[in-house]
């Protein structure tokens, strides 16, 4: 449970996140992707290499710390994270991996003089609050998608029905469900996760 004291400690770390959030998230990703290779497919490796992913996470953590008393201010950011997580089929059991690696990065990057036991405890409680919020919101999206006409939950096999060259650089791929069933309505620009099986 996130206490008032925890909130105060998290808010007190905002200047540290402003100054060194990216170093913290780079360390976090380095640790997590090395020690938990099973989560690597959930992350865009080009964004890892360019630093875009660590920057985005650093900004998200900073915004969370700044608004920990007013989580409703994070609505658009949380909504975007939830949609991305659902497209990748992020599961509740993956959150403890992220949490343990994040707390470890805080301790290792900030050092024991700053990342005291009280700071780690506060950030542990704060992370759990955020994880619970995301898990709940993601479950709502998963359940709503499964309940829609043509909807489903989890992975569903599709086949390429046709390929249309649109230009020298763009090809459109039209997919159809392998089970022949209907597909729920979709919107341009929404996230979708693909796992490809390529012969040869």
Model segments located where?
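FNR-like FAD-binding dehydrogenase module
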Residues: 1-200
